Regions:
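Alpha-helical elements of Rossmann-like donor-binding domains used by nucleotide-donor carbohydrate transfer enzymes
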Residues: 120, 136-139, 143, 168, ...
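Generic protein-terminus/edge-of-domain signal
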Residues: 1-56, 60, 75, 245
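Terminal helix-turn-helix DNA-binding modules in bacterial transcription factors
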Residues: 171, 175, 184, 199, ...
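A hydrophobic/aromatic-rich effector-binding and dimerization subdomain
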Residues: 1-20, 60-132, 142-154
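Residue at a beta-strand N-cap/secondary-structure junction
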Residues: 45, 180, 228-229
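Short, Lys/Arg-enriched, Trp-marked, Pro/Gly-tolerant hinge/linker segments that flank
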Residues: 101-112, 126-138, 145-175, 179-193, ...
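Regular secondary-structure segments
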Residues: 40, 115-129, 170, 174-177, ...
């Protein structure tokens, strides 16, 4: 078992085994990079942006950036997984668009070629120095992602469920990030009460609606800043109330100011 953290384009590679997992060990989270999670064993649910999934051994979760997700143990049964966190820029755009258009779950239990990639991670970790391990993993991960892209053409995604009201809310949020989004907006669009919209969203997503909207806007802002747009123009585009509010929220979430993000281009 191992856990290696690094800098872009590969942020984390791990193979973990947890005895007696508990809910307190796992928090809902989101991040600006993509994730592959191979569920090896355990008894749990995953919530991926409101999609509730009870995984089977060797379910591969393909999680786009800026997607809320968390692990919910159902019993103390031991939990084993592989996790790879990485920049989507690691693969060509045509594969990126296919892989990360939405969360996808594939079962690779009967696919020895798929499982070989993860077995190689263990072999590389036990054989190479930390520096050479990361170099080898970059190449292996790039190959794995391209392999995933081709396998998606012939594989049947695992079906999971999401509350249809939440599905509608998430669609409205994604389509209207450049508007002054809030619970009132969603309530009007869906012809529901504001309190009902807020309650359903928080119960299903385990995050407040206002916080979710703010963070989705910030991830969109991050992409525009990396593309060269000015911080002031990004603030106006995503309808933040004022620049100081945008600056404060951005720095708290990203760890750098919007201007620093633009200068770094990363």
């Amino acid at each position: 078992m191992f856990e290696i953290k690094a800098k872009a384009p590969v942020f984390e590679i791990s193979h973990k085994y947890v005895e007696n997992p508990s809910a307190a060990q796992y928090a809902q989270h989101t991040h600006a990079y993509c994730e592959l999670l191979l569920f090896v064993r355990g008894d749990a649910n995953f919530n991926i942006d409101g999609i509730l999934h009870h995984p089977k051994p060797y379910d591969l979760l393909i999680i786009p950036s800026a997607t809320y997700h968390y692990f919910i143990p159902r019993s103390p049964k031991a939990y084993e997984n592989y996790v790879l966190d990485f920049s989507p820029d690691l693969v060509p755009i045509e594969h990126r668009q296919k892989l990360f258009a939405k969360p996808t779950i594939l079962n690779v239990g009967d696919d020895a070629e798929f499982r070989r990639f993860f077995e190689l991670l263990d072999l590389y970790h036990s054989t190479y120095s930390p520096e050479d391990f990361l170099l080898a993993c970059r190449s292996l991960l790039r190959e794995l992602l391209i392999f995933c892209s081709y396998r998606m053409d012939s594989s049947i995604p695992v079906e999971s469920t999401r509350n249809p009201l939440v599905e509608t809310m998430l669609g409205l949020i994604s389509e209207n990030l450049e508007k002054p989004l809030d619970a009132d907006f969603l309530a009007r669009e869906m012809m529901l009460s504001k309190s009902y919209v807020q309650n359903v969203f928080s119960q299903e997503m385990h995050i407040g609606l206002k916080k979710y909207i703010t963070q989705k806007k910030l991830f969109a802002a991050q992409a525009d800043l990396a593309g060269g747009m000015s911080a002031a123009d990004v603030c106006a585009k995503y309808e933040f109330s004022d620049y100081s509010s945008f600056f404060r929220h951005y720095k708290k979430m990203m760890g750098v100011s919007p201007r620093e993000k633009k200068r770094s281009g990363a």
